[in-house]
């Protein structure tokens, strides 16, 4: 499900396609996910975020967390390019499709983004950035990354992702080396 969300979004993928990919009958879907496709999407989002949190925690334990983050950003650029600029972040893809009426889905996405910011903040703290700055910078990193990813998908080119990643890392390294700045 998360791959379908990354490529085509919630409204771009049908229940029949999901059932076909999973090789299961419709009754199984509605037995485990009585809320249908929305409930399944929320479960997929939670699963993706959990995997990302585990990955970010592993990056934070590296001897150089910022270099590990830099390597991960390069890998994300390569993955996007390899997918033909189709495989973006499933959270962003679904978020762009929501309306004000999608309160349950929007709440789940809000929690998912908050979890990612928390994990990024923990990584930045491990890199030697003060907790208050790490929290604010995690918001910047996630927001800039998602925006650059969106632009790269639209343009079919990684240039904006590369520029954004480079500048983010420059800012983070400056913070790491200059940990005397006032909190935001």
Regions found by a protein language model. Name each.
Residues 1-5, 145:
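Short hydrophobic clusters on alpha-helical segments that form packing/core surfaces
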Residues 4-39, 43:
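Helix-turn-helix
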Residues 57-87, 138-141:
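Hydrophobic alpha-helical connector segments
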Residues 63, 107-108, 126-142, 156-159, ...:
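All-alpha amphipathic helical-bundle segments outside canonical DNA-binding/catalytic cores
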Residues 67-71, 82-107:
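Amphipathic alpha-helical segments used for helix-helix packing
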Residues 79-82, 122, 142-159, 171-177:
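Amphipathic C-terminal alpha-helical segment
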Residues 92, 132-151, 163, 167-170:
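Hydrophobic alpha-helical segments that form the core
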Residues 101-103, 113-137, 174-181:
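Hydrophobic alpha-helical bundle segments that form small-molecule/ligand-binding pockets
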């Amino acid at each position: 499900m998360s791959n379908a969300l990354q490529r085509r979004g919630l409204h771009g993928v049908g229940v029949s396609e999901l059932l076909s990919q999973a090789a299961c009958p419709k009754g199984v879907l509605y037995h485990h996910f009585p809320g249908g496709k929305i409930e399944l999407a929320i479960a997929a989002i939670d699963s993706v975020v959990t995997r990302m949190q585990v990955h970010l925690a592993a990056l934070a334990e590296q001897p150089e967390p910022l270099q590990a983050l830099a390597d991960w950003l390069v890998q994300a650029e390569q993955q996007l390019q390899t997918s033909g600029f189709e495989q973006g972040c499933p959270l962003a893809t679904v978020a762009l499709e929501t309306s004000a009426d999608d309160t349950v889905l929007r709440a789940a996405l809000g929690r998912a983004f908050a979890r990612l910011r928390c994990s990024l903040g923990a990584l930045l703290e491990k890199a030697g950035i003060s907790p208050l700055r790490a929290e604010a910078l995690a918001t910047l990193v996630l927001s800039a990354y998602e925006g650059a990813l969106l632009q790269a998908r639209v343009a079919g080119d990684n240039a904006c992702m590369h520029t954004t990643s480079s500048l983010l890392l420059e800012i983070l390294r400056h913070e790491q080396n200059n940990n005397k700045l006032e909190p935001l």
